[in-house]
Amino acid sequence: MMNMLSDRKKLILKAVVENYSQKRQPVGSKMLTYLPYLKFASATIRYDMVQLEKEGFLQKNHTSSGRVPSFKGYVYYLNHLLTRDHDVACMFESIDKVIQKKRFCKGQVIKEALNLLNNLTNYTTMAIGSDIFNNSKITKIDFIPLNSAQAVILIITDKGNVQHQNISLEQTKEISIYDLKDVVQVVNDLLKDKFLSEAAHIIQSDFFKKTIAKYICFQEQLIALFMEAFSSFASENLYFSGVSKMLEKPELNNPEIIKKFMGLLERKELLKIMLNQDSLSFKFSDGLQLTPLKDCMILSIPFDVNPNEKGRIAVVGPSWMKYPKVIPILEYLAVHLSKLNDQE
């Protein structure tokens, strides 16, 4: 049903998205009549815009007679209507120069490429250099008591990665350090030989909650502890560039929102959005309850870290970002980062 728009409606939706992206002003039917590929009467365009609004692809701006894209409209545009801007090819030479800096290790090349992507798009950029989440299995979860109220939990993977989490029972009288040791043993048996991505799903499942139901007073803390550890594994190769670019946006001109956004980055929660995607993907803030931004989106794409592992690069910006420009730059960068394997 989503793909059953008439050709005329598709052209109008595409025009609204791209016009709004460029001018950041609600789009009216009269404005669209000046476009060379929309040779229709203003009344015809206006009628179709009303229909697109009723179907949820456009929405009315209360301060103007024009319309702006809805999240549904953006999704349809990205899946069916996007055309790449070939003029961005002039920027590819600067990407090639970064990729060809053989004196840098791969991690440094990724950082340099990320800084360049930030400069080319003017948006916050980030990368995960290795998809540890999908390629590393848990070999052991160990419990080390420090005293009667404190302990350390170690999570070890088959790739030799280790994360530790401190745990305190000082304010929990319903469970002892010995009970906790038993719980961790149960978790170890449950997650051993599981990929970190599988383990993350298990930890958040109803099945897991039932398994440790006996210790319900400590359930939420335990789940949060393991999820933080899993995110920490992935963040070992996490890079950011241009965070200040997001803080310059008018929507973030609020101390409370800035605090939430910085906390989002510090807690590595954006990792959960980027992981487990095997192609160019996008997430809008209406489906991202963890982001404090109203009109935010994350556009990400995988690249080969080595023949067996994938990383991801991403752009974090407003929903009205210039997709015809940003996407081909992102795709070109991903392809050429993947080619680093051929040079080793």
Swiss-Prot record:
Family: Belongs to the HrcA family.
GO biological process, one term: negative regulation of DNA-templated transcription
MF terms (GO), sorted A to Z: DNA binding
UniProt keyword list: Repressor, Stress response, Transcription, Transcription regulation
Annotated protein name in UniProt: Heat-inducible transcription repressor HrcA
Record flagged with keyword Nuclease: no
Function of the protein: Negative regulator of class I heat shock genes (grpE-dnaK-dnaJ and groELS operons). Prevents heat-shock induction of these operons.
Transmembrane segments: none
InterPro entries listed in its UniProt record: GAF-like_dom_sf, HrcA, HrcA_C, WH-like_DNA-bd_sf, WH_DNA-bd_sf, WHTH_transcript_rep_HrcA_IDD
Organism superkingdom: Bacteria
Gene source species: Aster yellows witches'-broom phytoplasma (strain AYWB)
This protein's record includes keyword Repressor: yes
